[in-house]
Amino acid sequence: ALEVFELTGKPLSRHFDEQQTTPPPLDLHTIALIPENRALLHARIAERFGQMLRQGFLDEMAALRRKYPALTAGYTSMRCVGYRQAWDYIESGYGYETFVEKGTAATRQLAKRQLTWLRKIPLAQSLDPFAAQNYLQTASESVKHHFGI
């Protein structure tokens, strides 16, 4: 950014603002699964995080730390949701319930960011994965209709 400013006298952000935006040359038909029931989403996240723990997630973390002694919390792989909280739990020694709460909360926050991103892009259709409808069939029919298949 400093180099661009030095060479052109304009901040990098202005260069980005001045760029022409052209639509992609593809005929996109975007479909997203967006749950309407936030409480159900949170319950599913908690259920899935618990399942990961029962299937040995903390053992996996311990094995990684043994296999790669140079591994630190600063590595990108250890900053991912779940791994970061597991690392903190192992290092700090706070209670297991606190770890579960922090891991579940971090996963909910990630889901919220993903849903915010999805709502900002133009969607041909959004489907609720928790609704009684068969969303795979609905999505398939939508794609077939869009592309005239």
Indicate where each model-derived feature is located:
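Catalytic core of IPPT-family isopentenyl/dimethylallyl transferases
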Residues: P23-I149
